[in-house]
């Protein structure tokens, strides 16, 4: 019988994590459970930095970006002895279960703890939208708004100087954020990790645009594909057009979550408590066709593949 649960945020922060924590805490309290917050993710669990939360602990956090519990990357958690120490701390505080908010790496930690006798539920918290088993992750829509706003601003200056602008977008190895932002921002060219990229092909596309009368352009590219500064130099050299690169970086992770992220996080947080009370563990929550679902964590991480939005890319190419 579950009486006490813990909640932590792990990996890169994402707007809406606070809303998810609030959803977990308020839903758990409504069911008569005690809730404990773990500071700085699995690192805090290992170090025993755990404190009890009440309704007031999550007051006025739904609109705040980041995570008030803090987050940290802690690869040492893969070590069984490290996990045993974390389990010892959970026992010391009398915790029966855990809700983990984060990405794939965070999910695997939750699965290992479940195997050690502590049922865990994972919630997808990342701006990259790269977690399998869900259409959208907590933080994605807020980051999308941030990127589109940046593209709009770049367009203003690019058009003024008849310049080509390259904007590098986060996403790790998933192009969802770049693709959606490119469509919403009217970017002329898109470079995604899911599609083979040759800089010479991009230059040819840009040259075609120039012959059609394009005076300026925006190139949206997902991180880790190439050095965008070098790409800018190559484009300028080959086209004769002034070209500048902009790396948006961690600004994409910040800011107050948009309404949809707050709603999604709240629903997922409350749903995680329902699953724990039903006896589930080692599961991850998702939203598919606007319905909350749950999957086995290992199945989601190792076997499920996120479908590439090829139809979105086709649409984007028609519009440019």
Curated annotation (Swiss-Prot):
Regulation of this protein's activity per its record: Allosterically activated by ADP and other diphosphonucleosides, and allosterically inhibited by phosphoenolpyruvate.
EC number: 2.7.1.11
UniProt-recorded Gene Ontology molecular function terms: 6-phosphofructokinase activity; AMP binding; ATP binding; fructose-6-phosphate binding; identical protein binding; metal ion binding; monosaccharide binding
Keywords from the named record: Allosteric enzyme, ATP-binding, Cytoplasm, Glycolysis, Kinase, Magnesium, Metal-binding, Nucleotide-binding, Transferase
Subcellular location: Cytoplasm
Principal location: cytoplasm
Active site, UniProt feature: 128
Functional pathway: Carbohydrate degradation; glycolysis; D-glyceraldehyde 3-phosphate and glycerone phosphate from D-glucose: step 3/4
Alphabetical list of PROSITE patterns matching this protein: PHOSPHOFRUCTOKINASE
Biological-process GO terms, alphabetical: canonical glycolysis; fructose 1,6-bisphosphate metabolic process; fructose 6-phosphate metabolic process
UniProt catalytic activity: beta-D-fructose 6-phosphate + ATP = beta-D-fructose 1,6-bisphosphate + ADP + H(+)
Binding positions (ATP): 12, 73-74, 103-106
Pfam families from the UniProt entry: PFK
Chain sites annotated for binding substrate: 126-128, 163, 170-172, 223, 244, 250-253
Keyword Cell inner membrane attached: no
Co-factor requirement: Mg(2+)
Listed GO CC annotations: 6-phosphofructokinase complex
DNA-binding is among the record's keywords: no
InterPro entries reported in the protein's UniProt record: ATP_PFK, ATP_PFK_prok-type, PFKA_ATP_prok, Phosphofructokinase_CS, Phosphofructokinase_dom, PKF_sf
Residues reported in the UniProt entry to bind Mg(2+): 104
N-terminal signal peptide: none
Class of enzymatic activity (EC top level): transferase
Entry's family note: Belongs to the phosphofructokinase type A (PFKA) family. ATP-dependent PFK group I subfamily. Prokaryotic clade 'B1' sub-subfamily.
Annotated function: Catalyzes the phosphorylation of D-fructose 6-phosphate to fructose 1,6-bisphosphate by ATP, the first committing step of glycolysis.
Complexes and interactors: Homotetramer.
Protein name as it appears in the record: ATP-dependent 6-phosphofructokinase
């Amino acid at each position: 019988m579950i009486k006490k649960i813990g909640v932590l945020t792990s990996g890169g922060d994402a707007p809406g994590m606070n809303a998810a924590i609030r959803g977990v805490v308020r839903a758990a309290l409504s069911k008569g459970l005690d809730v404990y917050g773990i500071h700085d993710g699995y690192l805090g669990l290992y170090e025993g930095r755990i404190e009890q939360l009440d309704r007031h602990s999550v007051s006025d956090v739904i609109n705040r970006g980041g995570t008030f519990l803090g987050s940290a990357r802690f690869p040492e958690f893969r070590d069984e002895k490290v996990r045993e120490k974390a389990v010892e701390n959970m026992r010391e505080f009398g915790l029966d279960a855990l809700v983990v908010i984060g990405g794939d790496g965070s999910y695997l930690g939750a699965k290992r703890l479940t195997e050690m006798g502590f049922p865990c539920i994972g919630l997808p918290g990342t701006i990259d939208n790269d977690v399998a088993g869900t259409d959208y992750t907590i933080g994605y829509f807020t980051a999308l708004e941030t990127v589109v706003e940046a593209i709009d601003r770049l367009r203003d200056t690019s058009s003024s100087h008849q310049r080509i602008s390259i904007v590098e977008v986060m996403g790790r190895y998933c192009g969802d954020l770049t693709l959606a932002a490119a469509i919403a921002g009217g970017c002329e060219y898109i470079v995604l990790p899911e599609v083979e990229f040759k800089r010479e092909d991009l230059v040819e596309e840009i040259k075609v645009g120039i012959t059609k009368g394009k005076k300026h352009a925006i190139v949206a590219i997902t991180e880790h594909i190439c050095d965008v500064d070098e790409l800018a130099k190559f484009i300028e050299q080959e086209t004769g057009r002034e070209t500048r690169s902009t790396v948006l970086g961690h600004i994409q992770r910040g800011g107050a979550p948009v309404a949809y992220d707050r709603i999604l996080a709240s629903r997922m947080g409350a749903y995680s408590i329902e699953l724990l009370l039903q006896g589930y563990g080692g599961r991850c929550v998702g939203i598919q066709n606007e319905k909350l679902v749950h999957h086995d964590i290992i199945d989601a991480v190792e076997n499920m593949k996120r479908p590439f939005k090829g139809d979105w890319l086709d649409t984007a190419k028609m519009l440019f």
